Curated annotation (Swiss-Prot):
Residues annotated as catalytic: H450 (for 3-hydroxyacyl-coa dehydrogenase activity)
Subunit structure: Heterotetramer of two alpha chains (FadB) and two beta chains (FadA).
Protein name: Fatty acid oxidation complex subunit alpha
Species of origin: Shewanella baltica (strain OS223)
Catalytic activity: a (3S)-3-hydroxyacyl-CoA + NAD(+) = a 3-oxoacyl-CoA + NADH + H(+); a (3S)-3-hydroxyacyl-CoA = a (2E)-enoyl-CoA + H2O; a 4-saturated-(3S)-3-hydroxyacyl-CoA = a (3E)-enoyl-CoA + H2O; (3S)-3-hydroxybutanoyl-CoA = (3R)-3-hydroxybutanoyl-CoA
Enzyme Commission identifier(s): 4.2.1.17, 5.1.2.3, 5.3.3.8, 1.1.1.35
Alphabetized Gene3D superfamilies for the sequence: 1.10.1040.50, 2-enoyl-CoA Hydratase, Chain A, domain 1, NAD(P)-binding Rossmann-like Domain
An annotated GO BP: fatty acid beta-oxidation
């Protein structure tokens, strides 16, 4: 053994080829500080052994290296610039040491080689991948750029245009696609991987392959004609900005770094990367996006733990077909859990099956599935008009019409047809789980399971704990949601649960602006372009449906009369009373038509302006800051109330609920990350300026205490 540490082992194979194996104690290899230090020490040991003629990098795991240890980032990035620069330079010195070894090197890549893992393989002269490999630099998704030489080496290996696409999108690349652009030199079967890499090194040692020419290309400036380079980078800037926009600076920074570094040798090029990396690491956007990644890991970790308490779900059922039932059936069946779709009407079953078939056909059309897989998934969906079909179901999801009496009746009926230990969940967005539980003989096996529409696109599922729900019930539904490919958060029962409870104060703020003459299209523009929502409040209400919004608003007003009670007619009432229901009937705040691709197209409608003018008078202009404050303050305070009341368990789960359930702008990180970035004291001062508008604008005592103590919701 040439070198051994808890994360890396180096041994000498036949023909004096050394093998460096990444072998961290956990399930995957990461580039944490310990691994970087071990790699540095391992390379020193390798350099001192004069017998070594070549080096192959391998992994003992199913994956190569998944990237840097992101749990270290927030603490590290909070350091002074000088400390951060020192860390980046030390890390890059290790990668340079690997690249500069006096003999040929190769990487044997299986599974993921992402971020720092990808940057590792770029330092070697040859790269062999097996068919499971996925390679990429996802750093821009975290608000930063590659920091271990990725922006320098990748363009010199695969060309500037390909590197720009890889780095600015942050997407993983399959082995076959990596081969096409020259990121890897060969793709082989998994069992042949190490042997293929070793054979390539033998050929290099025997001078059949010119490894030094390959290395020199990476150490030198890019060989791009000046005019071609200018055209490439100008085009890239336009395309990247069109996608990333002003709120996500990292992709544009990556283009700029690659452009500036293209005429430099390795040392100067790396310095350009270092400076850009440090600048981005200090941004609020990086903090927010890294926070989302960590929160996502936290929420999924909780779901994984729940799996240990969960009852195994081998068969499921959904009651109520149609679009929602079909979406739930598709999601369950496509992830491997057979499901019965039960309804009282054949047309509804047909609609549900058509919805599943439509979603599957789209997967086939995009090359993400095959007709054979589509047929298998459809065979996993059993439509039925008879309750007898659900008797073997481990979990039954009730998804009938949103009416408490109908749901209660269906839930009571279901208990008579399923086994004693079957779990029953209601897909409701507004009806109290405790209320529905009263219709059941065994309320301990009942909880809420709130899917968001469209089911196949929205990642969040709210699992609602009623006062009688058992831990096994909650754990089982959480595990089932995870198995369906969803991100579940557990919330306690209250009107609106978590997501709708915090959404409707936002709509109340919007209604307040319109009642004073606000222009809904101008408000939408501010909330989309400046705050960063995917759609503004008027457009969102049209998509949700103004009938749904009207009903949910009434539920919230009844549940929280002090803050959400209404004293008169608001804009939602005006639209609803004039049968303007939004996209579903072609007219709401906006009017809708179908574009050439068959997608809904919205236009401003003078009729809706006329109705609002009749109700609230002439239009009045509001400043953008005023619009943001009046819509967001109520949502933020209500989110904090949910945490304080224990409706949601942690800031992390609340923020993921907002990002995954409502599309809260990821670059802001969620309400609690936004509060920490803004400063709780600054928010309290802002809210106090609007406190005269009512209870929705009045901060809690706990918020005032936190502000006075200069506290924060996250610890890093």
């Amino acid at each position: 053994m040439i070198y051994q540490s808890p994360t890396i082992q180096v041994e000498l194979l036949e023909d004096n080829i050394a093998k460096l194996c990444f072998n961290a104690p956990g399930s995957v290899n990461k580039f944490d500080r310990e691994t970087l230090a071990s790699l540095d020490a391992a390379l020193d040991s390798i350099k001192q052994d004069s017998n070594i003629k070549a080096l192959v990098l391998t992994s003992s795991k199913d994956t190569f290296i998944v990237g840097a240890d992101i749990t270290e980032f927030l603490g590290l990035f909070a350091q002074d610039d000088a400390v951060l620069l020192s860390w980046v330079e030390q890390a890059n010195a290790v990668f340079n040491k690997l690249e500069d070894l006096p003999f040929p090197t190769a990487s044997a890549i299986k599974g993921f080689a992402l971020g720092g893992g990808c940057e590792t393989i770029l330092t070697t002269d040859f790269r062999i991948a097996d068919t499971t490999a996925k390679i990429g630099l996802p750093e821009t998704k975290l608000g930063i750029i590659p920091g271990f030489g990725g922006t320098v080496r990748l363009p010199r290996v695969i060309g500037a245009d390909n590197a720009l696409e890889w780095i600015t999108t942050g997407k993983d690349q399959r082995a076959e696609d990596a081969l096409k652009v020259g990121a890897v030199d060969a793709v082989v079967a998994p069992q042949a991987l190490e042997a293929a890499a070793i054979q390539m090194l033998k050929d290099a040692v025997a001078e059949k392959l010119d490894w030094q020419a390959r290395r020199n290309r990476k150490l030198s400036a890019l060989t791009l004609p000046k005019l071609e380079a200018m055209m490439s980078f100008t085009t890239a800037k336009g395309m990247v900005f069109a996608v990333a926009g002003k709120h996500y600076p990292a992709p544009m920074a990556a283009v700029s770094v690659i452009e500036q570094a293209s005429t430099k040798g390795r040392a100067e090029a790396l310095q350009i990367e270092h400076q850009a990396f440090i600048k981005l690491a200090k941004t609020d956007v990086a903090k927010a996006l890294i926070g989302i990644f960590l929160n996502d890991q936290f929420v999924k970790g909780k779901a994984k733990k729940a799996g240990k308490l969960a009852k195994e779900v081998n068969n499921a059922a959904v009651l109520g077909a149609g679009i929602m039932g079909g979406g739930i059936a598709y999601q369950s069946a496509s992830k491997g859990t057979p499901i019965v779709m039960k309804d009282i009407a054949q047309p509804a079953l047909d609609l549900g099956l058509n919805e599943a078939a439509k979603l599957l056909s789209a997967q086939v059309a995009r090359g993400r599935s095959t007709p054979e897989k589509m047929a298998k998934v459809l065979n996993n969906i059993t439509p039925s008009l008879d309750y007898a079909a659900i008797k073997h179901s481990d979990v039954v999801v009730e998804a009938v019409v949103e009416h408490p009496k109908i749901k209660a009746q269906v839930l009571a009926e279901v208990e008579g047809y399923v086994s004693e230990d079957a779990i029953i969940a209601s897909n409701t967005s507004t009806i109290s789980i405790n209320l529905l539980a009263k219709s059941m003989k065994k309320p301990e096996r009942f909880c809420g399971m709130h899917f968001f529409n469209p089911v196949h696109k929205m990642p969040l599922v709210e699992v609602i704990r009623g006062e009688h729900s058992s831990e096994e019930t909650i754990a089982s539904v959480v595990a089932y949601a995870s198995k369906m490919g969803k991100t579940p958060i557990v919330v306690n029962d209250c009107p609106g649960f978590f997501v709708n409870r915090v959404l409707f104060p936002y709509f109340a703020g919007f209604n307040g602006l319109l009642a004073e003459g606000g222009d809904f299209a101008a408000i939408d523009k501010v909330m989309e372009k400046q705050f960063g929502w995917p759609m503004g409040p008027a457009y969102l209400l049209d998509v949700v449906g103004l009938d749904t919004g009207h009903h949910a608003q009434a539920v919230m007003a009844e549940g929280f009369p002090d803050r959400m009670g209404k004293s008169g007619t608001d804009a939602i009432d005006v639209m609803f009373e004039n049968k303007r229901l939004g996209q579903k009937n072609g007219k709401g705040f906006y009017v809708y038509s179908v574009d050439s691709r068959g997608k809904p197209k919205k236009d401003v409608d003078p009729t809706s302006y006329g109705l609002l003018k009749d109700a609230f008078g002439e239009l009045k202009a509001f400043e953008a800051d005023d619009i943001i404050a009046r819509t967001m303050i109520p949502m933020i305070i209500e989110t904090v109330r949910c945490l304080e009341e224990g409706i949601v368990a942690s800031p992390a789960e609340a923020d993921m609920g907002l990002v995954y359930g409502l599309g809260f702008p990821p670059f802001r990180g969620g309400v609690f990350r936004y509060l920490d970035t803004m400063g709780v004291a600054n928010f309290v001062a802002l809210a106090d300026k609007y406190a005269h508008l009512g209870g929705l604008y009045q901060v809690t005592d706990a918020m005032r205490t936190l502000a006075a103590n200069n506290g924060s919701y996250y610890q890093a």
